[in-house]
A protein has these predicted regions:
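A glycine- and small-aliphatic-rich helix-loop capping segment at beta-alpha/alpha-beta transitions
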Residues: 55-64, 87-88, 161-169, 233
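Short, conserved loop/helix-junction motifs that constitute active-site signature segments
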Residues: 59-68, 115, 207-211, 245-249
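Class I SAM-dependent methyltransferase SAM-binding "motif I" and its flanking Rossmann-like core
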Residues: 154-204
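ATP/nucleoside-binding phosphotransfer catalytic cores, i.e., glycine-rich phosphate-binding loops
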Residues: 6, 201-262
Length: 262
């Protein structure tokens, strides 16, 4: 597999990858604190970055995290009593806000000298999706965006194949391919019927415009197809949205041996 000119980093396993990425992020967080500014970490929910989040919590034990912002990529939308779409309840097992609170901020704050404040978790809002990119831009952009790829259709955030490559945050009708991938991402779903049919997401253009650095993380044998598609593309391929990493400033592909074995 070849990725053209984009850097590719290979690791023996997901733990090694997560530790290396956590080291890069921790260095940036420390530098931002010294400079007296916020550090925005772009985060996916789900499986791909779990080893990174765990390693980051270990590395940042005892640190001041009051300037850290967890900028999530997306959130599920469900119909409210009036039929209008609204963000999933954070208590729901699949809520991206809930994931950020429980699996990212929670472990980080448990050992922090100064925790991430409650207002330090950002998500796009279905009531005004475009405002999210404006907020990210006003904050100076995302210092490092962790990207993940859908296993079967290459979606990144909730952007399915064929999404506008320059698009901003939007309300996404989730295709069946993405919803099937989400059955594995959130295993408490008992059937496809339980997976929400809409989400609000950063757009592909948001990722490109707002990222100072981007790291596409591919871990495990289930991501072999994704690794092959992104590596062989050699550039952006509209049929595999995660290939947007090729368009990002300081974009890199990080994968473990199992994902690279395809």
């Amino acid at each position: 597999m070849s990725a053209g000119t984009i850097p590719v980093r290979r690791f023996p396993d997901g733990d090694a990858l997560g530790d290396a990425l956590a080291a890069e992020i921790a260095e940036g967080i420390a530098s931002a604190r010294i400079a007296g500014r916020r550090y925005l970490l772009g985060c996916p929910g789900g499986r791909s970055a779990r080893t990174t989040y765990a390693a980051l919590a270990r590395r940042l034990a005892g640190s001041d995290l009051g300037h850290l912002v967890i900028a999530m990529m997306d959130e599920y939308l469900v119909p409210g009593p009036d039929g209008a779409l609204r963000a999933a309840d954070p208590a729901a097992h699949y809520s991206c806000r809930g994931f950020a609170e429980r699996e990212i901020a929670g472990p980080l704050n448990a050992r922090a000298a100064r925790p991430i404040p409650a207002e330090g978790i950002w998500l796009p809002d279905a009531a005004d999706p475009a405002a999210y990119e404006a907020r990210l831009t006003a904050a100076g952009g995302i210092d490092l965006f962790i990207l993940a790829s859908g296993a079967s259709d290459g979606h990144v955030a909730f952007n399915p194949p064929g999404s506008d490559p320059d698009g901003g945050p939007w309300i996404v009708p989730l295709p069946e391919s993405t919803r099937r991938d989400n059955l594995a991402t959130f295993p408490d779903f008992r059937s496809l019927d339980e997976v929400p049919r809409h989400g609000v997401s950063v757009g592909l253009g948001t990722i490109v415009r707002c990222s100072r650095r981007a790291r596409l993380v591919l871990i495990g044998g289930g991501k072999r197809t994704a690794a092959a598609r992104v590596m062989d593309a050699g550039g952006y391929d509209a049929s595999w949205p995660a290939s947007v990493v090729h368009r990002c400033t300081d974009g890199e592909i990080w994968l473990d041996a199992a994902a690279a074995a395809g």
